[in-house]
């Protein structure tokens, strides 16, 4: 498992409840750009799309792969929403827990799995209060 991008701030801002590994729907040039470490994870947001009944990864900035010709991908938008691949049962569990208990879905890291697929590790997490962050800082 090779980690391609990591959200270090999430460790400080959130308490973990559960973790999930989700696949991503990417095109071939986006996969190559991710494997070349050309994407950042700090601004990512995960939202639920009620029309498609799926989770979307928003603000994932993947620039065009350097060796790709512009004519092969006309009108490419680097920050378009990308769909997360999870079971419907997992999606309903995540959405229900965010609505019921006030937890948030946080993307933690982008990694290449053993089968050479690009995946995202996501947390179901609780936001820490400012006082809890200070206590955590003094302990560490």
Stretches found by the model and what they are:
Residues 2-103:
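Ribosome large-subunit tunnel/peptidyl-transferase-proximal elements
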Residues 3, 24, 122-123, 132:
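RNA pseudouridine synthases
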Residues 85-129:
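Beta-rich strand-turn-strand
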Residues 45-46, 70, 106, 118-119, ...:
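Alpha-helix boundary/interfacial micro-motifs
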Residues 139-140:
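Conserved small/polar residues in nucleotide/adenosyl-binding loops
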């Amino acid at each position: 498992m090779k980690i391609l991008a990591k959200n270090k701030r999430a460790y400080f801002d959130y308490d973990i409840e559960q973790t999930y590994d989700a696949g991503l729907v990417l095109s071939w040039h986006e996969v190559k750009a991710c494997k070349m470490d050309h994407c950042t994870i700090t601004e990512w947001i995960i939202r639920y799309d009620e029309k498609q009944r799926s989770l979307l990864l928003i603000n994932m900035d993947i620039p065009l792969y350097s060796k790709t010709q512009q004519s092969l991908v006309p009108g490419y938008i680097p920050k378009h929403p990308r769909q997360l691949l999870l079971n419907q049962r997992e999606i309903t569990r995540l959405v229900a827990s965010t609505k019921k208990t006030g937890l948030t879905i946080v993307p933690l890291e982008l990694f290449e799995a053993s089968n050479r697929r690009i995946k995202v590790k996501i947390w179901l997490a609780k936001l820490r209060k400012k006082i809890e962050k200070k206590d955590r800082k003094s302990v560490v």
